[in-house]
Each structure stands twice: as C-alpha cells, then as structure tokens.
Amino acid sequence: EEFVEVVVKALTNETFSHQGTFWTFPPEGFINPHPHSVYADYGQGVAPDMSVSEIGIAPRPFQTPFPQLYGGFTASMTTAKFWAQYAGRPIVLAEDLDFCKTIWSVYRDEAAKFGHDITPGDEAGWGGLMICAETDEEAQAQFADIKWFWDKWPEQFGQGMPKLLVGAPDTLAREIEAAANAVPINECFLLIPQGLHTRDQIMHSLELFGTKVLPQFSA
C-alpha cells in the first residue's frame, strides 16, 4: 500500500517528501553530490548547502490529477477495495464471471466512499492469456507450451492459471461477449506468451485478434 501512496504523492505534487515504514524519500541527510548554485536558485527542495529536503518528477503528468493507475492481477475483494480508494483500475483475469460481478460491485461501492464516480466498464480491466489461431485445435496445440511452463514454474509458486482466451477468432469473440454480458468492460487485458512462442506465432496471433476478433466489438 505504501508504494502507491508514494506514487500518488509524486504525481500530484511538484515536490514531495515521504517518511514511511518501508520508504523514505529523499534519504535522510541526502546531499546533492554536484554542488551548483543553479539547483538552489531555480530548483525546489534544495538548500544552498545542497541538502535535499524534497524531490519531484519532471515533466509533470499531462492528466489531471494523475494518469490512470492500474493494479496488476487482482484476485480478491481486499485488493479491489484498495484500488478503489484511488480510482485505480484492477486487472482481473478471472474465469468465474460471478466472481467478476462481485468484484465490479464491491469496487463501485468502495470507490463511491472516496468520492469517485466510476463510469460503468471502468471498474476493472478484464482479460486473460490469449492465443489466437486459425482453428481451436491449432490454438490448443500452441497452448501446450504454456501449460508445461505454468506447471513447472508459476503453479509451484501458488500462481493459478489465468483465464484462457485460447482458440479461433470466433471462439475468442464468444468468450469476450459472454464476459461483457456479465459485467461492463471498457478495457480488455491480454497476456501473450512472449519468451515461449516464436515471434511469428505471436505476430500471427495478434494479427488474427486485431483483424478477426476486435472488429466484432467495434461501435
């Protein structure tokens, strides 16, 4: 939680300081190792002796009050409620659409407590692991590499398989439509098997998704 507090401070203030449980910005007693009067004359948070009391980021964010925040791979109500405080958008890669309905509802209610009016569909981003191929059989054959990797690595760290969007374009479109009928979705988040599939496999999958799946949802 504290790192989000630090990020929000940095995005909403020209300069800031933070003394927390895990993070301290700037470090206590920090001295600019490159003394020059320009820092104190034209900068902020720097004294003539080059001691630094506050830091900032530049250039400043274009969006107000700050760019959209995203919470990676939310799988609990607690996490959804945390991000709702900041109108941050959790990413939910869930197969269980009843679970998604609950997440969306809990998020909206919690966001309202902090004065955030959430547009339907902005409660969370929904999606999954995407492999798009000419046929369902071909996509499933490509998925075998992912299944092997997941069993050998993430699963042993307690990380379950995300929602699978694996199949031909029409199959993926039906999956997305089913989710969109359950909860409003404005953003679809796709995991792609970079590092496991070849460049050509991934590019073909993305091309099929972009030309055969997305047009089915254009306004």
Describe each region flagged by the PLM.
Residues 8, 91-108, 112-219:
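C-terminal amphipathic alpha-helical "assembly" element
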Residues 1-81, 85-86:
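Internal, glycine-rich beta/alpha segment that forms the wall or movable "lid"
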